[in-house]
UniProtKB/Swiss-Prot annotation:
<dbReference type="Pfam" id="PF00398">
    <property type="entry name" value="RrnaAD"/>
</dbReference>
<comment type="similarity">
    <text>Belongs to the class I-like SAM-binding methyltransferase superfamily. rRNA adenine N(6)-methyltransferase family. RsmA subfamily.</text>
</comment>
<keyword id="KW-0489">Methyltransferase</keyword>
<protein>
    <recommendedName>
        <fullName>Probable ribosomal RNA small subunit methyltransferase A</fullName>
        <ecNumber>2.1.1.-</ecNumber>
    </recommendedName>
</protein>
<dbReference type="InterPro" id="IPR011530">
    <property type="entry name" value="rRNA_adenine_dimethylase"/>
</dbReference>
<feature type="binding site">
    <location>
        <position position="83"/>
    </location>
    <ligand>
        <name>S-adenosyl-L-methionine</name>
    </ligand>
</feature>
<feature type="binding site">
    <location>
        <position position="100"/>
    </location>
    <ligand>
        <name>S-adenosyl-L-methionine</name>
    </ligand>
</feature>
<dbReference type="GO" id="GO:0003723">
    <property type="term" value="F:RNA binding"/>
</dbReference>
<comment type="function">
    <text>Specifically dimethylates two adjacent adenosines in the loop of a conserved hairpin near the 3'-end of 16S rRNA in the 30S particle. May play a critical role in biogenesis of 30S subunits.</text>
</comment>
<dbReference type="InterPro" id="IPR020596">
    <property type="entry name" value="rRNA_Ade_Mease_Trfase_CS"/>
</dbReference>
<dbReference type="InterPro" id="IPR020598">
    <property type="entry name" value="rRNA_Ade_methylase_Trfase_N"/>
</dbReference>
<dbReference type="GO" id="GO:0005737">
    <property type="term" value="C:cytoplasm"/>
</dbReference>
<keyword id="KW-0698">rRNA processing</keyword>
<keyword id="KW-0949">S-adenosyl-L-methionine</keyword>
<feature type="binding site">
    <location>
        <position position="58"/>
    </location>
    <ligand>
        <name>S-adenosyl-L-methionine</name>
    </ligand>
</feature>
<dbReference type="GO" id="GO:0000179">
    <property type="term" value="F:rRNA (adenine-N6,N6-)-dimethyltransferase activity"/>
</dbReference>
<feature type="binding site">
    <location>
        <position position="12"/>
    </location>
    <ligand>
        <name>S-adenosyl-L-methionine</name>
    </ligand>
</feature>
Amino acid sequence: MRQSKKLGQCFLKDKNFVKKAINRAEITNNDIVLEVGLGEGALTKELAKIAKKVYVIELDERLKPFADEITAEFENVEIIWSDALKVDLKNLGFNKIVANLPYQISSPITFKFLEEDFETAVLMYQYEFAKRMAGKPDTKEYSRLSVAVQYNADVEFICKVPPSAFSPKPDVNSAIVKLTKREPKYHVKDEEFFKKVLKAVFQHRNRTIKRALIDSSHEIEVDRDNLKGILEKIENEFDFTQRVFKTPPEKIGDLSNLLYDEIANLE
């Protein structure tokens, strides 16, 4: 079958990486596993041999012959023919996720997962995306993505995966990443506002926090002059001279809370 470029299909063929993903997810016969992207079923079959239940969300119904073969062999596999971004995941009851994700939905599907109550996710991403997810302050990989994902999950970069592990071979390297869900390590008063602050400051990651906020005041929906006034008012409560890429996540959380309170006072 010719894979769909539109759907970003690159099927994982190398069984060594299939086994590595399953091993790092520590799958047991009590686990209910979610997979996104059936492919030719290489990962699905190995999951089904161990897990109690495997849900697979797949959009491309041309893969039905592979699905039929797998469901005939494994009674614990259920295929959901739909767009993973549109499926209500709440009722599936999975506790682990293992998937070779279509790269063009990497960001939205990851944040959709993070809204759910799961233990562990072992996921395949484009290499550069994976490095940014795991990025730490004062590195070139540290980004809005790093802070947003690490807010309520620990991120472990497991290994680089070469194009030769897939069919067809993608033009880029890939990587396996493990996400372990947890409670946030710091408190933000409003998560949606926190996301706006992240977007605002990381548009200018090499600038100071103060300069980045002023230049992206529209992202937090505050008039530029009003924002300047707020920053002057709270200048002794936060180090606005620090560069964005050097500012730890919890400090950005503190910044978000300060701004949230001050903006509320404007209304």
